[in-house]
Amino acid sequence: MKREFLPILLSMVMFVCACSEPSVEGPEQVDNPNNTEQEDPNNGEDNKEEAKCQAGEYYKSGLAEGIIAYVDETGEHGLLISLDEGYTQWSTDYIMLVVQGGEFSREDGARNTAYIKSQENWEDLYPAVVWCNGKNALGLSSWYLPAPGELAKAAQHVDAINATLESMGYDVIATGVNESYWSSEEFGVQGAYAISMASGDFADYGHDKKAYNRVRAMRKF
């Protein structure tokens, strides 16, 4: 009788130990014998806040890599500004562009850039656009010369952007009194708008197209 009882007792001990062994992965489990759905007291708001992007953060997804310059009201989309910059002319000649269907956009640099790239010999005539377009790969047109309004949005967060650039070893965005960045909006035959990243302001008269200014590319994400 004792010999028959011993194997049964051992099997019971092994079963209890296996069921009560703590999990080595994941958080501690809360008893929920009815397997009912647990209500989230925060309604998921904490997780949503953590997932939102912020201006000044480094961003990389696929071929998109840069610093977040602006975030829209969703917290998930906005504008990236390039990690590096160029120094070049807006145009090598005084030619006034006539935009088909209206004027240059104050807020949509991608549209402005696409129009400039549609011009004959654009690669010889528009060095600032060429520099920005050089960041595109696989035939894409994601990077562009930003519009004045897009640069102005980035200027609002220039301190946060520069802090990240500096921590990564890149040149910061210049904010000196006489430092400006080319936008993609033309101003007459001889001018184009250039933006002060210290204030986001731009001269009403534009800058000489043949003059040299700084250039940063932007793209949407």
PLM region descriptions:
Residues 16-56, 221:
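Bacterial Sec-dependent N-terminal signal peptides
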Residues 40, 44-137, 179, 191-195, ...:
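Extracellular adhesion/carbohydrate-recognition regions
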Residues 140-146:
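Surface-exposed patches in mature extracellular/periplasmic domains of secreted proteins
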Residues 14, 135-136, 158:
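Hydrophobic, Leu/Ile/Phe/Ala-enriched alpha-helical segments that form helix-helix packing faces
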Residues 138-140, 175:
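Short helix-terminating capping/connector loops at secondary-structure junctions
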Residues 20-27, 148-221:
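C-terminal, surface-exposed recognition/capping segments
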Residues 1-17:
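Sec-dependent bacterial lipoprotein signal peptides
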